[in-house]
């Protein structure tokens, strides 16, 4: 269930803060956004990507010099939606620190590796999975051929970025992403997808 679906069911906790001017209530995600914490929970799609991008841009406008924490628990999803998040992470001035909690797969793992170097983390029992781009073109043969060429170009683009972000040779990344490649948190650190496995706050 996505965070949006959970919100639709009215299951997102509310936080009430006291101030000299009275009480103010926030949903938990809005309150955490005040602390520069952004979540990607569930599938990466146009809706979740638009929310994440908007939050990153808002936090940059609030303070371009202060890091943003990006927590990821996602099975992946749309490549184009994920690349919108990736490009925004690289575009904005603040460093984006990434943290895997639970599971970061496919585009989720790609975005985990996209954090600022030295600021990519995983909790110890998280799982990370990388694989090649998935496609599902239908229609006339010529259209399928056009889509196949585009998918191969996208696959090559993502492998090159992943090789750059992890420090792994491109040929190794190509081989490893041919099929689902699961890693523990420690293996993800060794691979270069994260910089540190953390068990508690320093």
From Swiss-Prot:
GO-annotated cellular components: cytoplasm; endopeptidase Clp complex
One Pfam family of this chain: CLP_protease
A GO BP annotation: protein quality control for misfolded or incompletely synthesized proteins
Alphabetized InterPro entries for the sequence: ClpP, ClpP/crotonase-like_dom_sf, ClpP/TepA, ClpP_Ser_AS
KW Protease (keyword) present: yes
Enzyme class (EC, first level): hydrolase
Alphabetical list of PANTHER family matching this protein: ATP-DEPENDENT CLP PROTEASE PROTEOLYTIC SUBUNIT (PTHR10381:SF70)
Function, as annotated: Cleaves peptides in various proteins in a process that requires ATP hydrolysis. Has a chymotrypsin-like activity. Plays a major role in the degradation of misfolded proteins.
Identification of the protein by name: ATP-dependent Clp protease proteolytic subunit
Organism of origin: Paracidovorax citrulli (strain AAC00-1) (Acidovorax citrulli)
Native organism taxonomy: Bacteria, Pseudomonadati, Pseudomonadota, Betaproteobacteria, Burkholderiales
């Amino acid at each position: 269930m996505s965070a949006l679906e959970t919100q639709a069911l009215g299951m997102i906790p509310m936080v009430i803060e006291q101030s000299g001017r009275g009480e103010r209530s926030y949903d938990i995600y809005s309150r955490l956004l005040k602390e520069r914490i952004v979540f990607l929970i569930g599938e990466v799609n146009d809706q979740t990507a638009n929310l994440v991008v908007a939050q990153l841009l808002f936090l940059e406008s609030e303070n371009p010099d202060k890091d943003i924490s990006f927590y990821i628990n996602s099975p992946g999803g749309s490549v184009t939606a994920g690349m919108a998040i990736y490009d925004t992470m690289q575009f904005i001035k603040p460093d984006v620190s990434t943290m895997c909690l639970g599971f970061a797969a496919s585009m989720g793992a790609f975005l985990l590796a996209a954090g600022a170097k030295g600021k990519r983390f995983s909790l110890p029992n998280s799982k990370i999975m990388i694989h090649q781009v998935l496609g599902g073109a239908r229609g006339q043969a010529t259209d399928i051929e056009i889509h196949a060429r585009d998918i191969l170009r996208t696959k090559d683009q993502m492998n090159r970025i992943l090789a750059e972000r992890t420090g792994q040779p491109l040929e190794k990344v190509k081989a490893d992403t041919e099929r689902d490649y699961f890693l523990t948190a420690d293996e993800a650190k060794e691979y270069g997808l994260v910089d540190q496995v953390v068990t508690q706050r320093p």
